[in-house]
Structures are given as structure tokens and as C-alpha cells.
Amino acid sequence: MSQRQFKVIIIGGSVTGLTLAHSLHKIGIDYVVLEKRDTVTPQEGASIGILPNGARILDQLGLYEAIEDEAPPLGATRIHFPDGFAFTSLYPKRMRHSFGYPIAFLERRQLLRILYDALPDKTRIHVNKTMSTIEHFTKDEITGARVLTKEGDVYEGDLIVGADGIHSQTRGEIWRRINSSKSAFKTAEEYSCCFGISKCVTGLIAGEQVMHMRNGRTLVVIPSKDEVVFWFLVEKLDRKYTYSEAPRFTIDDATALCSQVFTLPIGNNIKFEDVWNKREVVNMLSLEESCLSTWSTGRLVCIGDSIHKMTVNLGQGANCAIEDVAVLCNLLRNMCQLKSGTRPTEQEIDLLLRRFNKQHLSRVTQITNMSKLTVRVHARKGVLHRLVGRYVMPYFGAYFEARPFNMLADAASLDFIPLPKSSYPGWEKYSSKTRGNSRLLPLMFTLPLLYFGLSWIVGIYWKPGYLHAWNS
């Protein structure tokens, strides 16, 4: 068999795709990135949060210092409720002290620029290349896969990775090959999100986030450096939609929604209307919630938003995708080392991708489920979520934050690069290897805590007519 170097074709110049490019470079695997737009740094009005699980991998790749320069760390969150109660959560500060990395928000375009600028060979990035067809081929005793673009170009390689987002063409090709259908894409769209970036907003403190948890909606405002403010407003839709029937929104829809929260205070005598009036870019879309169980077939695999999609509240969408990259690259590196320069067969690649799917699915499912819970607590969906948000979080928040800390501590990383900041206590303290895998013990403590906590709440706050006022 020919000794031609193993090559990966990456569909999509996304955060996921560019992170994969950096990781492949580290292990000496040839690659090419195909992006359908005319730039890999488009302005979409979106911010992105980098949390410790994603930050650690980016730090391994030598990319995190540039992110730190752009994004002031979150130190606290001021959380407001409909009844006028508010409290300050130091969850972001405790996260940084535990894991060494803060919650850092920056423009998605800024992160894409950082990833692109740091690439050692930008000639591997091809814009204006829209995938048209994927074929398997045999040529001169060499087998592989090729991508044909609508522009008439042909790219050949051994593995095709779809990092092309929620509307993934690569995923569609996988479905076609396994005789599946779009009905298998069991995404639910129960919430919408209007998000934007405002500039020249004076009077707010960088790194002090503000959240309003209302009935059916959540407003989050994140002041950053240089008087830039990131914000998003999540709204519960009138019903649950499927992927194909989800509503589309206009700027008029965004304006109408945001006008309903103009009077909400952000701090220092600033209302949300003041932030809205300084907007630079605004967008609105429905939020998908999904986690596919099948990610690959043959020489094709999907990662990132093309296989798992979450709402913005937990901030794990990009971070989970970065973990996808780490798990896949660890397996690819091991395979290439075992082959000692001989290109793997299609059967060997297919087996590796199935192993990737099986190994990482439970982790992705865990994060997706936590994201689903978070958006519903923030939007106060139903009595239980309202009780947790209003009466458990303010008083027992430090106890219940152990669950997301457990999730962070069990994050994947690149196993061939030393771990930075591994001396921070949270990575070991909250790891499943340290705490064990038993779910019974946490439950034994959690249920009594909820019982006595809710009994205390009812005893203090219950009075005739109170429940009606609380639900309004």
C-alpha cells in the first residue's frame, strides 16, 4: 500500500473545525479545511463563552493566552427575580479558584480570528468552498474519500470530518449512507434567543454579569472590556417545535421581544433599554436541543453542533465541541502510531470512529442534559424549577454547584500534551476518579436538603394569595 500521508478533510471553518486543524498539526496529520463562506471570521453578532474544560485544551494548543488578553474573567453574577429579590453568586469566582480558568466571554469572531491567526499554514484553509458530493474511491491501489465542491474543486483524503454546524451537510451524507432519515434527528426547539453586542456602554463593570430570571424568559448581560457589552434574551416559545418546522425571526421580532424587558435594571442606574440603544449587531433564532446517538459511518464523522446542540445558558456548546476534537485526535494519534506510516484501511477507520462515538457519547449526553436543566431553571419553567431557582440557588448554591464542577473535572483533554494548571485543586477534587462513580451518596444528601429547605420556605413564606403573586 502507498505510504502517502494520512489526510483529513475538515468541512467547516468553525471554532470546532479550526481547533481540529490545530490539533491535527500537533500530531503531524495532514489536513485541509473547506469553508463555504468567503471568510472564517464572519460577524454574526454572537458572543462565546470559554469555560475550564474548553480552556484547558486551548491552553494545551498554545491558544489560551490570546483569549485571556481579549476577555476579562467573570467574577460574579447578580441574579434578579420577578418578586424583586436579588442576590450575588460567586460561582464564576469559585470556578476560577478551583480550576485555574475563569468563565471568559468574547466575540465569536474574535475567537475565530485568534484560531486562524495562530495557524502555522493558512494555505490549508479554503474559503468559498461548498461541499456538493462525497465519494469513496480506489485509485492506483489507494482507497480514500473525496469531496467535490459546487465550485468544481476536488479534495481527496482518508477521513472526512463534518464541523459544519446544525445544518450539517456531512451529517446528511451519513444519514444517506446508513439509510437513515431526518426523522432520526430528534431535535426539539422550545426556546428562542435574541442576542447581540452593544458598544460604548458606560457605567458597567467588566466581568460582573447580570441575569434576570423571569417567568418564561431569561435576560443575561455581560459587560466586557472597552465598554463592550454582550447580551442575550432567551424566550420560551409558544410550543415545542421540531427541526424542520422551527420558526424564523426578523429584526422586528427581535425588537418586539427586547422592548418587553427595556425597564429591567442592569446596574448603576442603567436599564436594558440603554444597552439596546447602543447595539451594534443583533440576531434572533430558535435554539435547538439535541444529542445524536450515531456520529459516523465509513470514513465520515461529525463533531460539534452537527451532533449535539445546546441552549446558550450553560455556555457549553463550544466547549463540548472542543472536547470532541480532543477525544478524536487522541484516537487518531494512537492509530497512526500503531500503523507506523502505513495508511489505515477503511475498516480500521470505521472502527476507530465507532470507538470515538461509544467512548464520548455518555459525556456529551451528560452535558446536553445539564444544559436542558439549566435553561429551564433560568426560565422558571414550572413550579419545581421556580423553587430551585428562587429558594435553593440563593441559599444552597455553593453545595449544588458541585454537579457542574464534577462535569468540568471529568473533561477530556489531549493526552499527548502536558496538562497546564493541573495543580489547581478542582481537577482532582471533583473528578469521578476521586469521588467514585456512586450516584446514591449525593442523592442521600440532596433529598434531605431539598426536603428541609422547602419545608423552611413554606413555613416562612406561605400565606393566603402568595402563590398567585409568586406565579405572576
UniProtKB/Swiss-Prot annotation:
Positions glycosylated per UniProt: N128, N179, N369
GO cellular component: membrane
Industrial or biotech use: Diterpenoid pyrones display various biological activities and subglutinol A shows insecticidal and anti-HIV activities.
Membrane-protein topology: Single-pass membrane protein
Signal peptide extent: 1-24
MF GO annotations: FAD binding; monooxygenase activity
Enzyme class: oxidoreductase
Superkingdom classification of source: Eukaryota
Family: Belongs to the paxM FAD-dependent monooxygenase family.
Protein name: FAD-dependent monooxygenase dpmaE
Organism: Metarhizium anisopliae
Gene responsible for this protein: dpmaE
